């Protein structure tokens, strides 16, 4: 990743992944930016279903992992999603049976937050 033209170290990074990937996604990344080591930690993700008709999101709150699917009648569901990002697991939500999700086959945007204090 290139950070040469930035004026300020970013607080958030995002990583877009197109479906059908073979390489692993890291839960943490460390970069040297402006001479300083900066660590980013995976916080959330948005995933598009295999048939590309629906999105769902995955968040971390108080160190717990959750899923949210707008078409479901539930709000935040406890869901251990970080363990699935490099697996071939597929899943469906209760109210959207036709939508199948998979971190390796679907389009995903991952969001990372900066773990160091600001300058």
Q: Predicted segment positions?
A:
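Core regions of eukaryotic protease modules
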Residues: 1-37
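Conserved catalytic-core surface of thiol
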Residues: 41-119
């Amino acid at each position: 990743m290139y950070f040469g033209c930035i004026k300020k170290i970013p607080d958030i990074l995002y990583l877009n992944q197109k479906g059908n990937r073979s390489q692993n996604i890291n839960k943490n990344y460390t970069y040297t930016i402006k001479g300083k080591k900066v660590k980013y930690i995976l916080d959330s993700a948005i995933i598009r279903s295999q048939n590309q008709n629906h999105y769902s999101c995955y968040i971390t709150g108080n160190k717990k992992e959750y899923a949210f699917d707008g078409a479901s009648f539930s709000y935040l569901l406890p869901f251990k999603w970080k363990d699935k990002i490099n697996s071939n697991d597929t899943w469906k939500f209760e109210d959207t049976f036709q939508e199948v999700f998979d971190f390796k086959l679907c389009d995903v945007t991952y969001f990372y937050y900066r773990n160091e204090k600001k300058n």
